[in-house]
Regions:
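Short coil/turn segments that connect the beta-strands within blades of beta-propeller domains
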Residues: 1-2, 53-55, 99-101, 152-154, ...
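Conserved beta-strand positions in repeat-built beta-propeller and related beta-rich domains
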Residues: 6-9, 14-15, 59-62, 105-108, ...
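Beta-rich catalytic cores
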Residues: 17, 44-46, 90, 143, ...
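Short loop/turn segments immediately following beta-strands, especially the blade-tip
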Residues: 24-31, 70-77, 115-125, 172-181, ...
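A short beta-strand motif characteristic of beta-propeller blades
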Residues: 34-40, 79-85, 128-137, 183-190, ...
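Asp-box/WD-like beta-propeller blade repeats and closely related beta-sheet repeat scaffolds
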Residues: 78-150
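Loop/turn-rich, solvent-exposed surfaces of beta-rich toroidal or solenoidal domains
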Residues: 247-280, 284-312
Length: 347
């Protein structure tokens, strides 16, 4: 058996149908998901991460200012430990450092990365550091949407959408494992209104791929882990040239083989696939696929190599088989009903 922890939206302001942080038991032989727990603590347990030993889980509560910690029990269900208020509005992403010392949270309207101390019992402690993306005017911020480690967990890539009062950008930040503070080593500014959203790092730690939400683009960057420098090399559309309707790029992943990049698009409800040149890192589109649902806000690869898409507005998680030789997605017809899913973490 394996397990999946599914975050969701729960509030009427989000027109959500989610009930809470859900735990599913997965039969590895049949692929069937069984709901074993739905934990109701704070609203909108939207994005999650685990500690390095997979004994604890941490969740942000989207649209609010809170972050929660949970112990993963022997039966893989969750026990709530504590919830803290970090002050920054709308935490949207969360990760943990390689020493299990600090939890890092990105806040959208807060425009700030928060470093939170992690106690010995796995619960959350005080905020140890804060790093803010300045806006166009004093008192304004650039809205951060992700905090992503490089493969060595020495640098953090943090995308900011910018929106009206800020600057659309992605920064590379060197991390101090001792203090939990960040030092900028590189910065990329996007075109106005393109809104950088999420990035993914190739296993070789030299190539980074970033999707822009409103620009509907995927960009390729070269990254130097010795200096922290990065350089934009290429951009491609995440939707076919025949698509003229509204679309928002939402998630980007490198497949487990390191051969392909995938990007999901909301409203056009599709997944774009790109082959990675194994020598140069440049991308070439190989196809577009229906996500078989509405609003694919999130997708990821499970340990078994299957791709799971969280379709927020159709209340489903859809399983696909991914052929790493051809880059094709094949629906398995395994569809898991769950309210307003926006994140999946496997254990």
């Amino acid at each position: 058996m394996s397990y999946a922890y599914v975050g969701c939206r729960t509030t009427k302001e989000r027109n959500a149908r989610g009930k809470g942080l859900c735990v599913y038991e997965i039969n590895d032989q049949t692929g069937v998901w069984k709901l074993v727990q739905c934990l109701k603590t704070e609203p909108n347990p939207s994005y999650q991460t685990m500690d390095q030993e997979k004994k604890f889980l941490y969740s942000v509560h989207g649209d609010f200012t809170k972050v929660s910690s949970y112990q993963i029990l022997a039966d893989h269900t969750l026990k709530h430990l504590n919830t803290i208020d970090i002050g920054g509005k709308n935490p949207v992403d969360i990760t943990i450092d390689k020493e299990n010392k600090h939890v890092i949270v990105a806040t959208l309207q807060g425009g700030t990365l928060y470093t939170i101390e992690r106690k010995e019992d796995g619960s959350l402690g005080d905020v140890a550091a804060a790093y803010t993306y300045e806006g166009k005017e004093e008192g304004k911020v650039s809205t951060i949407h992700q905090c992503l480690w490089d493969q060595r967990k020495n640098y953090l890539f943090a995308c900011a959408q910018g929106r009206i009062n800020g600057y659309g950008q992605m920064r590379a930040l060197r991390y101090s494992h001792e203090t939990g503070t960040f030092t900028q080593t590189a910065q990329f500014f996007a075109r106005t209104w393109d809104e950088p959203r999420h990035a993914a790092v190739h296993p070789n730690n030299r190539w980074v791929y970033m999707c822009e939400e409103k620009g509907n683009k995927v960009l390729y960057f070269q990254f130097d882990e010795k200096t922290g420098a990065m350089e934009a090399m290429q951009e491609l559309s995440t939707v076919p040239e025949t698509i003229t309707s509204y679309s928002d790029a939402s998630e980007v992943c490198v497949d487990p083989s390191g051969r392909y990049v995938l990007v999901s698009n909301r409203y056009t409800d599709s997944i774009a696939v790109y082959r990675i040149d194994p020598v140069t890192g440049y991308l070439k589109n190989t196809g577009f696929y229906s996500c078989l649902g509405k609003t694919p806000r999130f997708f990821c690869f499970a340990p078994n190599g299957r791709c799971f898409v969280a379709n927020e507005d159709s209340d489903t998680i859809v399983e696909f088989e991914f052929d790493s030789a051809t880059g094709q997605l094949f629906p398995t017809l395994n569809i898991i009903p769950t309210g307003s899913p926006v994140c999946i973490v496997f254990a």
